[in-house]
Each structure stands twice: as C-alpha cells, then as structure tokens.
C-alpha cells in the first residue's frame, strides 16, 4: 500500500514540476508563399471529375494496374473483392434518411453511396460499362425514392445536420465520377441534381 501511495505522490509531483517549468518557445511561423492581392481576380476553372479524383488520377491508376505494379495492383484487387463493388450489390433506397441521438437508418445511405463510388471507380479503371450502369442505378434509385433528411422523423434533432453533410458528400463523390458517362440519361442526372440540392441537404 505504501508503494502505491509513493508512486501516486511521485507521479503528481512530477506533473506539477513539469507544469511549473519554463514555457516552451514559440515556433517560427512560415510566411505566406506570396502576398495576397485583394484586387486580383482569382479564377478557377472546374474540370470534371474533380471532387475526389481527377482524370489524371485515373489515367495513372489504369497504367499502374495494367503494369501490375505494386502497391496499385494489390489495391485494385482489394477493391474488386469488396462486397460493395460487385454488380450483384442490391441498394436499399429509403424514403427518409434519419439520424438522431438514438441512431437512425443513415448507415443504409452511407453503404449505398459507398457502393456507388466503388462501382464508379471500377468502371473508370476497367472500362467495363456494367459497373457504370450499376453505379447509376444506385444514384437514380436514391434520387427518385428519398424525400429528405429527417424531414418527418426527428426534424428538430441537430444530428440531421451531420447526416446531411456526410451523406450529401458521399453521394456527390460517385455522381461526380459518373457525370461524363453517356449512359446516365440527362433527365435522370437532372433529377439527381435537384435531389442533392433540395432534399439530400437541409
């Protein structure tokens, strides 16, 4: 018992002595690389896809996979083994995405959005149109089924803002990859955009 007390007192003393030691010197902040001119017209040209991956990313990935270079080929094989990256994946669109302090069904949306993204990546790298069709099918299903986030269940729960944020982004990522797929009908793409702007956010 005495040893335990001595250990405790010694630990507390060490913490107190450390806390009373001289203050650490501040580091030297790195200067801006260049001065910001408030009158300068800063423009950025969006070149799709650009949310998570660029076309240059996919060109490099395709080349590395075709060369069977590591670690790219191992990563590709892991993706191809994922249950979310299979043509047989069955999405489960919900009328309402719900997140509250007791739980909710938001994971269903997250899983389906993740599957759409993985299928989209398989299409971008392999060129197999079946994966493009599967990804679009998931996106269309949610856009035509889901009417909002916590719009009737727990509408005042602040968790809905979290759901709108991360679920909205997760659906936007595969949609960004699929927007240049000619098989995604213009009218379906417009329905998806309206859903993302008006219903998948709060």
Protein language model features and the residues they cover:
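Bacterial N-terminal signal peptides that target proteins for export
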Residues: 1-9
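Hydrophobic helical h-region of N-terminal Sec-dependent signal peptides
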Residues: 10-14
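C-terminal motif of bacterial Sec signal peptides marking the signal peptidase cleavage site
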Residues: 17-19
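Extracellular glycan-targeting catalytic surfaces
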Residues: 24-199
